Regions:
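Long, contiguous binding/interaction regions
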Residues: 1-88, 96-196
Length: 196
């Protein structure tokens, strides 16, 4: 079995999307909720899959009124890498502070946090995030408020998750340390669907 990436044929035309958008958005809101985890008050992980990425691409094409093949292919090339490959989980990490001044200061103190997020399969070592591949996510002063993370699992971990063992998720940064052990069964089961 191979994880399918999106193609031009897996997307709807702008006209068709306009007709189904309201229904699809409602479905995606529920789907995304089942794949989201909050770590404390200020950090959220949104685990991606083909459906969440299809929604993002459809929305971008709609907003930009893109219908030419070249523009569609460009969006697919940008977003397909965010779909899990069958041996990993991929997520968008959001660092959220409502006050702009507080956010600026916190992003300074949280520099490097993207490398301190982990997933652990029960009975195994932590799997640390591989963050922002091919992207600059911080500068000398601060981290970014949005990061793209990948958690690469070995064959034994994948088999264990398919067998039904628990899973935990956390972050171990000196300025922000939170864990959920175990994560909800609903989240765990949704993420296991990403694995081959």
């Amino acid at each position: 079995m191979e994880i399918q990436k999106l193609t031009k044929n897996s997307l709807w035309t702008l006209e068709h999307y306009a007709r189904v958008r309201d229904k699809f958005r409602k479905e995606m809101i529920e789907h995304k909720k089942s794949r989201m985890v909050r770590l404390g008050e200020n950090l959220t992980l949104h685990f991606e899959d083909a459906q969440t990425i299809k929604y993002q691409v459809q929305e971008i094409l709609r907003i930009e009124k893109t219908f030419e093949e070249e523009g569609i292919v460009d969006e697919l090339e940008a977003y397909n890498p965010l779909i899990p490959d069958g041996t990993n989980f991929k997520c968008t990490m959001m660092i959220e502070f409502s006050d702009e001044a507080v956010r600026r200061e916190k992003l300074k103190s949280l520099k490097g946090i993207e490398d301190k997020v982990w997933v652990r399969v029960e009975g195994r070592d932590k799997v640390w995030a591989i963050a922002d591949e091919d992207l600059a996510s911080e500068n000398d002063e601060k981290t970014s408020a949005v990061h793209f993370l990948r958690f690469e699992l070995d064959e034994d971990m994948i088999k264990s998750l398919h067998y039904g063992v628990g899973m935990s998720i956390g972050v171990d940064h000196t300025q922000y340390s939170v864990s959920i052990d175990p994560v909800s069964l609903d989240l765990r089961n949704n993420l296991v669907k990403d694995l081959i």
